[in-house]
Amino acid sequence: MISYKDDIKHKFHEMRNKIERGDEVFKTEEWKNMKKGRMPLLIYGARQVGKTFEMREFGALYYKNTVYVNFETDERIGKYFDTDIHADYIIAILEKYYQVKIVPENTLIIFDEIQMCERALTSLKYFSEETPEYHVIAAGSLLGVAVNREKYSFPVGKVQMVTMYPMDLEEVLWAKGKQMLSDTIREHYENNQPLDEILHEEALQEFYHYCVVGGMPAAVKADLAKDSPLEQTEIRQMLLNSYIADMTKYANQTDTVRIFEVYDSLPAQLAKDAKKFQYKLIKSGARASQYGDAIDWLIRAGIVNKCMKCSQEFYPVAAYQDVSAFKLYYSDMGIMSARIGMTLEALQSMETEHFRGILTENYVAIALKTNGYDLHYWESDNTAEVDFLIQKESHVIPVECKAGNHVKAKSMMVYMEKYNPSYAIRISTRNFGMAKGIKSVPLYSVFCI
């Protein structure tokens, strides 16, 4: 049994005493110490991203005791929720079932794999309304899929929601004991001064390595343990297989087939010069009406990220998106490398130069999503395309990514001439810099954006 973050997280635990996801920085310590207004914390995230470890570690560090309930491994506990879901009743049941005293502020209650028990999810409403003094955290791997089912009564407005993503490159650097390198990268991102060439090359190698290993804790742990390349590949394949298993477990037969078909089409979708999702690449005659639900399932499961097209630059970007045109990206680089059979040696060879660009764009999509940005790209009459648009305060910033150091981009120039943004971002293997309104951001520093 792999303990997904045991060896990793202790190395930089003090640097991550908060969950940094979504549009806010939600500090778990602040949540614990809230005097009023605290609601149960509900953590979304793909399978094996580290949710269970985060919750149990938080309980061990900041509470006198923890009551851990896993609705997937213990079906019996879920039956008690069929009778009553008011908070006082649930507290009494948990105390008897686990033979432990639950004390407000001193006990953390964890509901794991809560999507397996509809009534437990609904009970969070009563913890929020009736007994806010109790500290409750819940999570589920397929939570996004589960709450989309009609039968679920989701506690709208009664929970604090947060999303966990795979470890980003900065977190992996921390895990490797390279905090000074990550700090230096952040410093040079801010001042736009080139990084020392030796450090620049070291950081680029870390980027290439990350593109293959990814950010799933099990894969990072195997990499840190210096497991053989075969063992590391097997772990990434295991993670991929767990995603595939979920497709059969949490969807009906018809939906499962279509989910598989969409997922299997992703390499071909991304290999095109124009990466807009095309249904015909799933199979001949495929239509949005047939496969829309399958795409939504993959998004809700945290397996893919969706990037919407915009043909205008105006703020807010989401108001001008074209819902019929989008791209899909893998949500983890290690899963992607396992799916396409990419190795570090192949990634750095000239034979895979074209696909290196695909990996780079997918990597940037993951990094932006992890930092809380909604994903959008810009296209103008099929003649010019900018990889990403991001909103920073009230500004819309175009982002172009290149796998190498050849950075001439006609589309970016078209965009800048048309909309005159405050500045643009170009991501490539080039060092930090700022010239002609374009901020040069090395590939390894996207976590700074």
Give the label of every model feature segment:
Residues 216, 220-390:
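Accessory nucleic acid-recognition modules appended to NTPase machines
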Residues 73-105:
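Short glycine-rich substrate-engagement loop in P-loop NTPases that contacts/grips substrate
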Residues 364, 368, 386-405, 424:
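Conserved catalytic cores of phosphodiester-cleaving nucleases, focusing on short active-site segments
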Residues 147-271:
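Interdomain motor-coupling "hinge/lid" segment immediately C-terminal to the ATP-binding subdomain
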Residues 51:
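Conserved lysine of the Walker
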Residues 54, 58:
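Hydrophobic positions on the alpha1 helix immediately C-terminal to the Walker A/P-loop
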Residues 110, 135-141, 163:
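Structural recognition of the conserved hydrophobic beta-strand(s) that form the central parallel beta-sheet
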Residues 2-35:
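Pre-Walker A adenine-sensing motif
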